[in-house]
Amino acid sequence: GAQSVNVRADPETIRQSIVASATERGTPIAQNQPNMVVLERTVTEANPALDAEFGPSDNGERKFRIRVRFQGTRCDTLVVQDVFVVNNAGTGLEQVFALTQPQYNPRQSLIGLKAKAESAGGCA
């Protein structure tokens, strides 16, 4: 399911931190809005576990879609991250499934975002 963390930074600092990290890693940004950033990463390797649970993605690419939402005030922002698998991305047969397994939505990515945003956020 969703992972969440409270960050001592404002939403704009969090948005900038997500965008900077994605750019550094070469992760495509699908949406960049004031209170939400959506990242997409193409799954290039075979993944039998995803095939077994969600069916094959044989009419288009399979992607992980990472949605990070954030809302709050200058030094208190709640960040919520959800991860989805998208079969046949960008086709008429596109299917989106929420991933609930913790290995697909690791908490350490949110902890890294928290550290980066708080170091830039100017809050004590």
What role is predicted for each listed range?
Residues 1-124:
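Ser/Thr-rich, low-complexity intrinsically disordered terminal regions
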